[in-house]
Amino acid sequence: MNVLEQQLNHLVDECRPYTAQGKVADYIPELAHVKNDLLGVAICLPDGTYIHAGDVHHKFTIQSVSKALTLCYVLMEFGEDYVFSKVGMEPTGDAFNSIAKLEETVPSKPLNPMINAGALAVTSMILGETAELKIYQFRQFLATLLNRSVEEVTYDEKVARSEYETTDLNRALLYFMRHHGIVEGDVDEIIDVYTKQCAIEIDCFDLARIGRVFAGNGEDPDTGEELIPRRVVRIVKAIMTTCGMYDASGEFAVRVGLPGKSGVSGAILAVGNHELDLNNVGFGIFGPALDSKGNSIAGMKLLELLIERYTSR
């Protein structure tokens, strides 16, 4: 264990008590069973190797972190003009599942792709004759980012079913958007794809590698091959910076200052930048105890302290 990894272990120990101040996402029944005090962090370095601490081998579902990745996928498939004709790019102070801004905005398109309405609109763009084919296309894209076979990128069927059966508000968002011409197709099929997308299983190393791809402007850290076009990376990082942490995005930008995306499983993906001594790196964090805004309470603190101690200025 090197000095940096020792420091990372101390940081996890320092932040783990914060888990007692949060609670797991019990409104999704299958997520309610996760231990509250888990906390782990992996950092993918410029050469593709990792340092890590805590509960990094614990598997969890990607949840809303997938919103940044489906946005990448549809931008690569259809281009920004089409995608942003259906969804905006402005932050909102409302909760991630709010319908309020849809009713107030003309035309009635979601304000950004990181809230549920926007993410559902993005998922509805994925092509395929069936829901399984659509989720396969997304799994294939994710497999490319992770340097794995598509068969190794799986979703938790129990979590997907649990979310599918308790997602009336998302259905309402879709019906509203379909009425206004923002989305097309069968609502239940879109929900099926969306819940399976959110139920894909990953760990801290996977998140950190994806963050490293973003930090390297879309290049594979092992081969240098372009996995995501630089322009798409820039767009998605900008939207993660302004909208990625639900209605705590502004606070996260001030306290941490990195592009990031969280999920209600306790996942946080963050992208290193030039202000860090740890430049050109990706961060993957897992801490299922959430704060009132749906972000990992200990994970947010861990990132804040990590950045505070490793900034170059």
UniProtKB/Swiss-Prot annotation:
Family per record: Belongs to the glutaminase family.
EC number: 3.5.1.2
Organism of origin: Exiguobacterium sp. (strain ATCC BAA-1283 / AT1b)
Transmembrane region(s): none
NCBIfam families in UniProt: Gln_ase
Subunit structure as annotated in this protein's UniProt entry: Homotetramer.
Flavoprotein among keywords: no
Protein name: Glutaminase
Domain of life: Bacteria
Molecular function as annotated in GO: glutaminase activity
One record GO biological process: glutamate biosynthetic process
Pfam families for the chain: Glutaminase (PF04960)
Residues binding substrate, per UniProt: S64, N116, E163, N170, Y194, Y246, V264
Alphabetized InterPro entries for the sequence: Beta-lactam/transpept-like (IPR012338), Glutaminase (IPR015868)
